[in-house]
Amino acid sequence: MSPRMPNPSLVVPDVLPPMRALVKAVNSVGVPLKTLVLIHLRVSQINGRPVQIPKKQAEFEAAGEEDHRLPVVETWREQDCFTDAERSCLALAEAATRINDREDPVSDEVWEEAAKHWNEVELGAIVLHIGLVNLWNRVNVATKQEPVDWRINPKKWTPMTSRLAQAQAQPAASSSH
């Protein structure tokens, strides 16, 4: 798949720095990174955004992964390896992503279960994280951006990092509008 254009966050002036700042703020309130990763993966799965994750123990170890639950996130309800707090986030992520599936997409039951495990600031960060993942999924799908390898440690997201660096080095295409 060849991208239709560079990532819009690199093309539109002054967009990427505030988006990065928002991600940094969301990541700094105390929700464990592993929980945010589970949310990111589940939202991307729902949106049909391909995510390349290791499928075998040896691949996890070679990649330096710590969380061997990633391949079973799609079937989290049937798994016993997720905490109640993580389950509440996955349910909230599904509900907030599938907003057209039912009349009341995020039911009081889903919200109240999440609120049992997270304080208001953490819950706000989780909701914002869900929204940000949905935003990035839609941008990437619309512009046919290539999926990146999935890594728990953001420093290991080298395919995206190298693509961003390459795109930033190239001048943006001028518009005739």
Regions found by a protein language model. Give the residues of each.
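Hydrophobic alpha-helical segments
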Residues: M1-H177
